[in-house]
Amino acid sequence: MKTLLRLLLKTQYQRNRSGPAQTEKGMTLVELLVGAIMAFLIITPMLGFVVDMLNTDRREQVKSNTEQDLQAAVDFIAQDLSQAIYIYDQAGITAINPATQLPPAPTNTTGTPILVFWKRQLIKNAVPINSTVSAKTPSACPANGSECNDTYVLSLVAYYQIRDTAPNSIWCQPSGGNCPTRIARYEIREPVRNPYTIDPTKPYYDAADLSDSQEGSKAFNKDFDFNKPTVNVTMGANFPDPEVLVNYIHYSSTNVPIPTGTQCQTLLSVTPPPPPATFNANNLLITDSSNHSFYACVDTSKNIARVTLRGNSLRRIQTDADYEATKSAYFPTATVQVQGLGGLGK
């Protein structure tokens, strides 16, 4: 009896141990396939949404950076123009003969002078107060300014729109496609004048008496006269290197608003002179017709200029970044109008 009971219990125990193993089941291939499809349908739109958000955020970031750069650029230009003595209009720049009298564009680039003017440049601690002080020349002026006064010199300033022809340039990134343009500034400055000279043929200190910052530019023409502002503008050689003000200015005129001389006439409130004097509104507009992204309206008689810049924020992240009206927000513009307050003897 005990043996029979032990056998039954043993059999039941083995059956209980093996029972669950026989009833366990995994997922079928169809179930796995359905699950994978559902996961794909759910995850793919989510990933697309995330990628779109990241791209949108990136575009907004470069747009913001471009707007800030443009504003900083026009603020700098406005400060520069505020000391202008004479601003050249289109006819004036043409009469100068830029090919020989203005700086050439850097190697492997094309460049157009857009804004050209004369200004006063402050040189601090540069002229001995009188003949009794120990500092007899500008270069000997002590740093504390106790023996020398500040002075002003003339500077010819030219803003160019420059575009690289080499697609791998550091100014053309991402490389390839149409390179953005940039704005560069040239400055040609006269040496410090000697107020104590007794020789009218030598209005300046000798080069040996001047420090590097007082010496001026080798391209400055000492024969320049404001009575003939388009003659002897520079020496035509030994031009200084340009300083880049801002990059990622738009590069094409396709679909962009095109400025006109008539618009400049309206914006600057220019009244044509009475006959028999002639008037051509196109002389008020200075632009590079290949892009119209950096242009100036100039009224030389009033010493006033209105400058406009158009950036291309999309070119910071892609090579195919042509202007479209639906994407105009990514091509921000900045404008400033300034009347030069500088003057000879002021």
Residue positions per predicted region:
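N-terminal secretory signal peptides that target proteins for export/translocation
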Residues: 1-17
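Intrinsically disordered, low-complexity regions enriched in Pro/Ser/Thr/Gly and acidic residues
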Residues: 119-335, 340-346
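Charged, solvent-exposed alpha-helical segments that act as regulatory interaction surfaces
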Residues: 10, 55, 86-90
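Long, hydrophobic/aromatic-enriched structural stretches that serve as scaffold segments
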Residues: 43-48, 112-124
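Aliphatic-rich helix starts adjacent to a transmembrane/signal segment
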Residues: 14-78, 82
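Short helix/strand-bridging catalytic loops that position acidic/His residues to coordinate divalent metals
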Residues: 58-65, 95-103, 133-146
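Residue-level detector of short, conserved catalytic/binding motifs and their immediate flanks
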Residues: 27-30, 113-115, 155-157, 305
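Short, glycine/small-hydrophobic-rich surface segments
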Residues: 83-117
